[in-house]
Amino acid sequence: MAKRLDLNDVNIYYGDFHAVQDVNLHIPPKAVTAFIGPSGCGKSTVLRTLNRMHEVIPGAYVKGEILLDGEDIYGPKIDPVAVRNTIGMVFQKANPFPTMSIEENVVAGLKLSGEKNKKKLREVAERALRGANLWDEVKDRLDKPGGGLSGGQQQRLCIARAIAVEPEVLLMDEPCSALDPISTLAVEDLIHELKEDFTIVIVTHNMQQAARVSDQTAFYSLEATGKPGQLVEVGPTKQIFENPTKKETEDYISGRFG
């Protein structure tokens, strides 16, 4: 079951550097929320805090609350690995395990969790590949290396790997930036289907993509280089693109800066 996320007074730091300040944001379930904004504004940084991925960077920490259906994912008794199973991540560059087979790629997370039943692993692989709209393209070569797929297929393989562990939320950090237009369209179509089962947050530099795939858009910016990024405006995507309330948002959407 998809879950909501709520960010309350979130501030993100890398050591002494204040990267993002005072973010308050509601991310609804079974919808796509897009993060947009100029480079360096903190949108990918915020995305990575949503499943504690930023913690792999020494000195990184968060102040404030990030709640998943009301539970603080930074609570003292919360296991970061469990958070990352519940809130999956798809990265900018497709990163399948190149020497693993297609099927092994999809079920890698389950195997790490101790699942050994071959029948169940095969069933999960098929379900996840179907969910990623990839099954019909690879069903006759599941034993072939994942690294042998095209770029667009590799990205959908990574999406299949993410959804195989049945997360509640799916984070996507510029998932189409390295793809050709046809592969991009395939991933965008997939995002529309996935939101029926998952809460989705996507970072994108592509304004047209944000307008096409998202239900809600959050615009981030920063006053100057070296200053913290901040959430300027959030609202329904149609409103943000057609009638934003902040001039800074309008300037960015219209291409006057960024």
From Swiss-Prot:
Matches recorded under SMART domains = AAA
Q: Which residues form the ABC transporter domain?
A: 5-253
Q: Which family does it belong to?
A: Belongs to the ABC transporter superfamily. Phosphate importer (TC 3.A.1.7) family.
Record membrane topology: Peripheral membrane protein
A molecular-function term among this protein's GO annotations: ATP binding
GO terms in the biological process aspect are:
phosphate ion transmembrane transport
Q: What is said about its interaction partners and assembly?
A: The complex is composed of two ATP-binding proteins (PstB), two transmembrane proteins (PstC and PstA) and a solute-binding protein (PstS).
* Source taxonomy: Bacteria, Bacillati, Actinomycetota, Actinomycetes, Mycobacteriales
The secretion signal range is: none
Gene Ontology terms, cellular component aspect?
plasma membrane
- Catalytic activity entry: phosphate(out) + ATP + H2O = ADP + 2 phosphate(in) + H(+)
**Gene name of the record:** pstB
The protein's predominant localisation is membrane
Q: Report the function annotation for this chain.
A: Part of the ABC transporter complex PstSACB involved in phosphate import. Responsible for energy coupling to the transport system.
Name the chain's protein.
Phosphate import ATP-binding protein PstB
Binding locations of ATP: G37, P38, S39, G40, C41, G42, K43, S44
Q: Which Pfam families match?
A: ABC_tran
**Native organism:** Corynebacterium jeikeium (strain K411)
EC number(s) for this protein? 7.3.2.1
Q: Which UniProt keywords apply?
A: ATP-binding, Cell membrane, Membrane, Nucleotide-binding, Phosphate transport, Translocase, Transport
Enumerate the subcellular locations listed in this protein's record, separating them with semicolons: Cell membrane
Q: Does the keyword Nucleotide-binding apply?
A: yes
